[in-house]
Amino acid sequence: MRCLPVFIILLLLIPSAASAAQPETKDDAALASFYDNAKRTLQRHWAKSLCCPEDAWCCSHDEGK
């Protein structure tokens, strides 16, 4: 009887695993690109926020990217 809940959970996970294995569509690729751009922008702003006002030169090396 202890295995019954585990078996039911595994049965519920099988359909979600099948959908995760499907190939990406054009929309998925565009969304991944959007998330990559957002992550890169947040990392750049995070790095700039770590600079002290007296060390402003540490932020200027990233401006050309």
Curated annotation (Swiss-Prot):
Q: In which tissues is it expressed?
A: Expressed by the venom duct.
The GO molecular function terms of this record are: toxin activity
Propeptide cleavage-removed residue intervals = 21-48
GO CC entries: extracellular region
Name the UniProt key words of this record, in alphabetical order. Amidation, Disulfide bond, Neurotoxin, Secreted, Signal, Toxin
Signal sequence coordinates: 1-20
Where does it reside? Secreted
Instruction: Spell out the post-translational modification annotation for this entry.
Output: Contains 2 disulfide bonds that can be either 'C1-C3, C2-C4' or 'C1-C4, C2-C3', since these disulfide connectivities have been observed for conotoxins with cysteine framework V (for examples, see AC P0DQQ7 and AC P81755).
Residues recorded with modification Glutamic acid 1-amide? E63
Report the sequence similarity comment from the record.
Belongs to the conotoxin T superfamily.
- Tell me the domain comment: The cysteine framework is V (CC-CC).
Protein name, UniProt field: Conotoxin TsMRCL-04
